[in-house]
Design a protein with these regions (language model features):
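Extended charged/polar low-complexity repeat regions
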Residues: 1-372
Length: 372
């Protein structure tokens, strides 16, 4: 597939804003042609992504979307202001501090209340305000953060370390219980103690950070072993039983031996795919699969030869399932990709409705009865 990324400069966005103001009969707002060259995050050249188009799809060459897959709108200061989905509907909006560029003071999911944020002089969030739900306040002290919700429930986070190695080592929960965590010198989890005082220990590999051993509060241990590609090759449980895995030269799983000794083998017919075309279990039963170029399951044949086929649309969503004896199920979606109907071979249809936020609000059964 080929995609076209539409980029805009600050000068282009400024001119577009001026033209929109003129055509609307309003006074053009202050929209600078350039942005400050440097920010605390590095150099800013003012270039922003405004849209992503699908321009070529070998699976659906004659059925390309007539609109962008996603669009972005920006403020005069180059801050992300709005996000539109593939249906053209606005799904996110952001508001920023007038004084501090890039500091978000409000965020809204379409159809939901606007969440607002307040900050202290150090740029830390002190309040998160939700007009239709729980709001939170944050109080910062050295190695301690107190979080209080609008029902006056309080949690306290105790921290250790500095900058990127700062970790929460103790948490006082609203119900009075306390949990604790321990970390090594590079910030990797070494132990967790629950509210009852029971400690689980973790042993990460010094180089990779992968967990090599877990010891539960009762002293029982599980061990994990990896190859040089960091793939799990063996896992031994507290009972001493072992799970083993083998991989081919491309790193694909080709055999798994369960703790009970049963072996499952995986076969591949495409050197460029990590999706198996067949599996064989310990009884010799064989299952086969076919996949699309995008990794979507197209067919599955079980050990008795029973075939199930799957259809997908250009967005990768499943549109139909075809089983033996002509039994099929069809699925329909709206422009936002939400499931709106499921119909079987006999024409029995179940429909689904959503609100503007994308929440499921009603299910209409084939007999017309409505739930929701």
């Amino acid at each position: 597939r080929h995609f076209r990324l539409v980029l805009t400069t600050q000068a282009q966005r400024a001119e577009e804003a001026r033209q929109q103001a003129i055509s609307g009969g309003t006074e053009p707002s202050a929209f600078p042609d350039t942005l400050p060259g440097y920010t605390e995050y590095g150099r800013d050249n003012g270039i922003r992504l405004s849209a992503v188009w699908l321009t070529h799809d070998p699976e659906y060459p004659e059925n390309l979307p007539a609109a962008p897959l996603v669009r972005y709108g920006w403020t005069p200061r180059g801050e992300l202001a709005v996000v539109y989905d593939r249906s053209g509907k606005q799904v996110r909006s952001f508001t920023y501090d007038d004084k501090y560029r890039g500091r978000m003071v409000a965020h809204r999911h379409t159809g939901r209340p606007e969440i607002r944020y307040r900050y202290d002089s150090d740029g830390r969030v002190t309040e998160q305000l939700n007009p239709a739900g729980l709001s939170y306040t944050y109080q910062y002290e050295k190695d301690r953060i107190t979080i209080t919700d609008s029902l006056d429930r309080r949690e306290v986070l105790h921290t250790q370390g500095e900058a990127g190695l700062k970790r929460v080592v103790k948490k006082e929960h609203a119900d009075g219980s306390v949990t604790q965590s321990q970390f090594d010198a590079v910030g990797r989890l070494r132990a967790q103690t629950d509210a009852a005082g029971r400690t689980t220990e973790y042993s990460p590999d010094v180089v990779t950070g992968l967990i090599t051993r877990i010891t539960t509060p009762d002293g029982r241990a599980s061990a994990f072993y990896y190859n040089h590609h960091n793939q799990l090759t063996s896992a031994t449980g507290p009972d001493g039983l072992e799970l083993r895995r083998e991989y081919d030269e491309l790193g694909r799983l080709i055999q798994e031996t369960a703790p009970d000794g049963d072996i499952t083998r995986y076969r591949y017919d495409n050197p460029h795919s990590d999706l198996p075309c067949a599996t064989e279990d310990a009884t010799g039963s064989r299952k086969t699969m076919t996949w699309s170029r995008y990794g979507q399951l197209l067919s599955f044949t079980d050990c008795s030869g029973y075939v199930t086929r799957y259809d997908h649309d250009r967005f990768g969503q499943m549109t139909a399932v075809h089983r033996e004896e002509g039994l099929s199920q069809y699925r329909a979606y709206d422009s936002r990709g939400q499931l709106i109907a499921v119909k079987d071979t006999q024409g029995h249809e179940t429909r689904y409705e959503y609100n503007i936020a994308g929440d499921l609000t009603a299910v209409i059964a084939p007999d017309g009865s409505r739930n929701g």
